[in-house]
Every structure is written in structure tokens, then in C-alpha cells.
Amino acid sequence: MSKQEKSNVEDKSLDIETAAQVETAQESASGALEELSVEEQLERAKDTIKELEDSCDQFKDEALRAKAEMENIRKRAERDVSNARKFGIEKFAKELLPVIDSIEQALKHEVKLEEAIAMKEGIELTAKMLVDILKKNGVEELHPKGEKFDPNLHEAMAMIPNPEFEDNTIFDVFQKGYMLNGRIVRAAKVVIVKN
């Protein structure tokens, strides 16, 4: 082999070696890039998971709030319906009260004739029947005589001195009060003691 051929072979050998080294370096660099890319992908995946978890938590919170709001709406509607049932006859009850008052006033008068006594008994039965119907529908009479005056339940029409009773005691009742299912329909008109 001539020197030139040897030199060419050596150059080719060097070229092959260099090419192999370059190729190895490229593979290493490519592997590093791939590893970096996998790490980046992992970070991105973690970020995506975190975003999805946050969104999921937000949707859960919104769903719970919507459920609570629907429950409140349902309860409010039930309460409104219940109140409508309880107090729907309030106007009716209020309009009947003067009838009861008139019957009770008629019953206070003494009657001596036999016919008038029978009529009075009939009125008493009618009044009792009317009061029973009102009670059945949630209307209650207030009989406050002897009780302490309560401006929420009673209307003071007059004040009188009486040392036998404490101040603000109801001495007499001009007109009975009425409640419908615990709510005042008409306050009792009363005379109270003021010493």
C-alpha cells in the first residue's frame, strides 16, 4: 500500500471515527431533548390535571350551592303554601266577628216572655255553632279579663283606678279579641287598671 493510500485510509478512518462521534453526540443530544420533552410533557400534564381538579372543585361547589338554593326555594314555597292555607280565611273570619258580637249582645238582655226565652235558646245554639265552626278553622277567642295588658293582643279603651288589682291588669273586656292560627285578627278592647 502506498503512502497516499494509507493516508486516505487513515483519513477515512478518522472521518468514520469522527462521524461516529458526531453521530453519538447527536444521539445523546437527541436523547436529552427527548428526556427534556418528556419532563416538559409531564409538567404540562400535571398543570392540566391541576386545572381540571380546580375546575372539578369549582363545579362541585356550584352544584352544592345550586342544590342548597333549590332546597331553600322548596322550603320557602312549602312555608308560603302552609301560610296560605292557614291564613287564607283571615278576611272571612274578620267579617264574621261582628255577627258573633251582635249575637252575644242580644244574649246579654234579659227576656221574660216564654217565646222570647225559646228564641234566646235558639240564638245561644246558633252562637255556639258559629264559635265551634270558627274554632275548627283555627279562630280562637281571647278572654283576657284578669290578665296583664299586652299591646300586641289588647287595645286599651279606658283606664280605671282599683286598689284591689295591680296596674295594667285587665279589669273588663268591651269586645273580645280573636286569633287565627296564633295571629291576631282583632285585638281585644279592654279596660285596664291604672292606680
UniProtKB/Swiss-Prot annotation:
Its main location: cytoplasm. It holds the Pfam family GrpE. The keyword Cytoplasm applies. It is found in: Cytoplasm. It comes from the Bacteria. InterPro entries: GrpE, GrpE_coiled_coil, GrpE_head. One of its GO terms (biological process) is protein folding. Belongs to the GrpE family. Participates actively in the response to hyperosmotic and heat shock by preventing the aggregation of stress-denatured proteins, in association with DnaK and GrpE. It is the nucleotide exchange factor for DnaK and may function as a thermosensor. Unfolded proteins bind initially to DnaJ; upon interaction with the DnaJ-bound protein, DnaK hydrolyzes its bound ATP, resulting in the formation of a stable complex. GrpE releases ADP from DnaK; ATP binding to DnaK triggers the release of the substrate protein, thus completing the reaction cycle. HAMAP family: GrpE. This is Protein GrpE. It comes from Francisella tularensis subsp. novicida (strain U112). The lineage of its organism: Bacteria, Pseudomonadati, Pseudomonadota, Gammaproteobacteria, Thiotrichales.
